[in-house]
Amino acid sequence: MASKTYQAGVKEYRQTYWQPDYVPLDTDILACFKITPQAGVDREEAAAAVAAESSTGTWTTVWTDLLTDMDYYKGRAYRIEDVPGDDACFYAFIAYPIDLFEEGSVVNVFTSLVGNVFGFKAIRALRLEDVRFPIAYVKTCGGPPSGIQVERDKMNKYGRPLLGCTIKPKLGLSAKNYGRAVYECLRGSLDFTKDDENINSQPFMRWRDRFEFVQEATLKAEAETGERKGHYLNVTAPTPEEMYKRAEFAKEIGAPIIMHDYLAGGLCANAGLANWCRNNGMLLHVHRAMHAVLDRNPHHGIHFRVLTKILRLSGGDHLHTGTVVGKLEGDRASTLGWIDLLRESFVPEDRSRGIFFDQDWGSMPGAFAVASGGIHVWHMPALVAIFGDDSVLQFGGGTLGHPWGNAAGAHANRVALEACVQARNEGRQIEKEGREILTAAAQHSPELKIAMETWKEIKFEFDTVDKLDIAHK
């Protein structure tokens, strides 16, 4: 460094940050951005600008560059690829040295990778498509507080997806009536019920009252059914201090699981709550409220597969992932990709599912994928086929909308689930034979028969906005 001299002025980013001959290190954090440059900005300069602005660069040369080893700390744009079917944008692959980031801090990673660079004038639109976290960084993060196997052991539930229900209406119920709805659903054979993400501590139902009535309902349902039950008590709060106060009370009354809105509540709060859950033996259900603001635009924002990885690192035992078949956004190939990123120990690069890098999670536990949003009994065969056993199938209106009430809706879901699991275990093609499987099960379950009649015409056949780029070919 002593031989370097300072030359004031502005130089092209590509002179420093575009290195097509660079071979990424095993310890580098790798990112794939989809870049739409402004007119007149060529690809190499745009990619280098993103590398610079998301790492060590600024708009002009500064003399303090000479006080450190810029060649070591800088981000490097090392590859550019075409986006299938879209000539206006391109993929840029950027490598960042691991020492740019605080250990175990996904907050710090996001501050750089999706920070000010997203407002850079030379870039018309920018999207973070994927990130490869090296195992050296993964091991500094806490990850899920319990993980899939520990949760199964705690809840004594094996060999099938778990069944849940979000209590509706999402807002307006009193605590006592809310607890009644929880009891009916759990008594009807569900494993879990859930606070809607909108429920915190509003005037119509304060959090402490809700917690008490819900836990009473849970214990009563457990006593009557002989099964372990739980309700996701949402501890998301205006401040971290209040969040921990609510979490402590949930533990005090014997609740097995709490809930947090990890994007609306903040990644820092989520990581802290995950650590608290790990230390206190609590399960943590995570909702993704606000995600579509970040991930739905196919040209600007953060892809949900990145948000999935960030959640697994930050900590959560469940994460909502979409359904493929329900009312919320998410195509099948992409959804299967981020489900694997949530649950598996190693996920190889697979462009057909939108996965740009190998991802090694080492010994970090996986988390349950939660399917929720506009699902009902007719979706059960597809849900079991798509999500497999390590999932939570979270119905709302598909339970509470049953003409005979909540318990009947819950019972219909449980019968449909067990029929599909049994058929799958017998080697049947449950997606193709779903109608026959459900019809046969309904012969012994009037609750299922009525549910099938009620929702036989309900479909959500809208095209996906955020498709895999390969689908545009």
From Swiss-Prot:
Q: Name one GO molecular function term.
A: magnesium ion binding
Superkingdom assignment: Bacteria
Sites of N6-carboxylysine modification: K194
Q: Where is the active site?
A: K168, H287
Sorted keywords for this record are: Calvin cycle, Carbon dioxide fixation, Lyase, Magnesium, Metal-binding, Monooxygenase, Oxidoreductase
User: At which residues is there a site annotated Transition state stabilizer?
Assistant: K327
- Residue positions annotated to bind Mg(2+) are K194, D196, E197
How many cofactors are bound and how? Binds 1 Mg(2+) ion per subunit.
Q: Lyase: present as a keyword of the record?
A: yes
**What more does the record tell us?**
The basic functional RuBisCO is composed of a large chain homodimer in a 'head-to-tail' conformation. In form I RuBisCO this homodimer is arranged in a barrel-like tetramer with the small subunits forming a tetrameric 'cap' on each end of the 'barrel'.
- So what family is this one in? Belongs to the RuBisCO large chain family. Type I subfamily.
Which PANTHER family does the record associate with it? Answer: RIBULOSE BISPHOSPHATE CARBOXYLASE, RIBULOSE BISPHOSPHATE CARBOXYLASE LARGE CHAIN
**Oligomer status and interactors:** Heterohexadecamer of 8 large chains and 8 small chains.
Function text: RuBisCO catalyzes two reactions: the carboxylation of D-ribulose 1,5-bisphosphate, the primary event in carbon dioxide fixation, as well as the oxidative fragmentation of the pentose substrate. Both reactions occur simultaneously and in competition at the same active site.
What is the protein's given name? Ribulose bisphosphate carboxylase large chain
| Organism name | Nitrosomonas sp. (strain ENI-11)
Q: Which lineage do the record's taxonomy fields give for this organism?
A: Bacteria, Pseudomonadati, Pseudomonadota, Betaproteobacteria, Nitrosomonadales
